[in-house]
Amino acid sequence: MKKFSFSFLLFLSLLFLNVGATFAQNIYLRAGEFTLKGTTVKGFENYVEISGVQFGAEAEVSFTKGTGPAIGKPTFDAISITKSVDKLSNELLRSIATGKSFPLIEIVVAARNSQGEQRAAHKIELQDVFVTKISDASAQCDDCGTLAESVNFVYKSIKITTYSFDPKTGAPTANANPFEFDISRMIQDF
């Protein structure tokens, strides 16, 4: 019985180690020349790594007696990211101070394919991007990384593409119908 229990526990621990590796993800941001050589990760050399991204949209809802819900014009939240202070930080500050926009920002959530390579699984592209808020934070600890910052962006248009991976080759395939929306004109365009 002890041999079975040990073998079963070993099997479970190896299974969970593998699951963690299979679903590991990283998030990267690219802002043209400002993120060149931002990482050493193959395929993402011209990005900087970020630790979190938050995005949302909302439509006002009203209920009229007898007709059911009516959906109003959508509003898109600012995109918020969290990252370490890095080579992009001063450009973000310069952007908010001068009111200058970034022509294009890409945020990519990368996952490991069946070959263990990091590939894009979800990509958000933003056009005419303005920085609206930057907050830096730090806490004292023995081996903390670096100063962290949260940044909010607003944008004129957005495109979201999702990808699937071929289970045998690991090659990514983009969804044939990405979400595209020009917020300033309220039409599906990028």
Region roles according to the model:
Residues 8-18:
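Bacterial N-terminal signal peptides
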Residues 22-190:
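Glycine-rich, low-complexity intrinsically disordered segments
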Residues 1-4:
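Positively charged n-region of N-terminal signal peptides that target proteins for export
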